[in-house]
Design a protein with these regions (language model features):
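Glycine-rich flexible loops
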Residues: 1-171
C-alpha cells in the first residue's frame, strides 16, 4: 500500500481527536500532503467513518487538481476536502492540516469575531490575533474561500459556528 506510514499517522491522530474531545463523534478531519504515482496531492480522512474503525486503506488520496466527484476511491473524502486542497495549494509550507469541532472553539467561533492578543500563545497562529472565517455551509467553495482569507499570514483560524482549522509541518 502506498503512503502507509502517512495513512497510519492520520489514523493515530484521528483517534486522538476523539479521545481528547477535540472532535467528538465523527466530526473533524485530518490530512497530510502526499504524492502518489507522481501526482501531488494529499491523504485525507474519509467521510462518515468512525475513527475507531479506520484502516489504512480507508484514507483517501486526492490530487491537488482533483474534485471529489472525480475521485475513484472506494471511500468518499471528507466533505471538507475542498479547504484542505485549497490550503495546500495556497500555503506551500503546509504539510499537515487538522480541522476539529472542539466544543470550546465552536462556542467561541459562534461570535464570529477574531480572538484578540490577550495571551502570548495567540502568536502561535502566526499573527497578532486568531481570525474567524465567515460562516458558510460546510463543504462549499464559499467556506473554503473564507478559510483561506482568514488564514492570510496565519497558520490557524476559527470557522464561524463550526470549529477551527490549523496547518503545520507535521501532525
Amino acid at each position: 500500500m502506498k503512503n502507509l506510514d502517512q495513512r497510519n499517522q492520520i489514523i493515530e491522530h484521528s483517534l486522538k481527536l476523539n479521545s481528547t474531545n477535540l472532535s467528538p463523534l465523527r466530526s473533524g478531519n485530518i490530512s497530510l500532503r502526499a504524492e502518489q504515482d507522481n501526482i501531488q496531492g494529499y491523504l485525507i480522512t474519509p467521510s462518515g467513518k468512525k475513527y475507531e474503525t479506520l484502516k489504512p486503506e480507508d484514507i483517501v488520496f486526492m490530487g491537488l487538481n482533483e474534485e471529489a466527484e472525480n475521485n475513484d476511491s472506494v471511500n468518499k473524502p471528507s466533505s471538507e476536502w475542498r479547504f484542505h486542497r485549497d490550503i495546500y495549494v495556497n500555503k506551500k509550507d503546509a504539510q499537515a492540516i487538522v480541522h476539529a469541532h472542539s466544543p470550546h472553539a465552536t462556542a467561541v467561533s459562534s461570535h464570529g469575531k477574531s480572538i484578540p492578543p490577550f495571551h502570548y500563545m495567540i502568536a502561535l497562529a502566526g499573527g497578532e490575533d486568531i481570525k474567524c472565517a465567515e460562516y458558510a455551509t460546510f463543504g462549499t467553495k464559499e467556506l473554503s474561500q473564507n478559510v483561506i482569507k482568514a488564514l492570510e499570514n496565519r497558520s490557524a483560524c476559527l470557522m464561524s459556528n463550526h470549529g477551527q482549522v490549523a496547518f503545520g509541518k507535521n501532525l
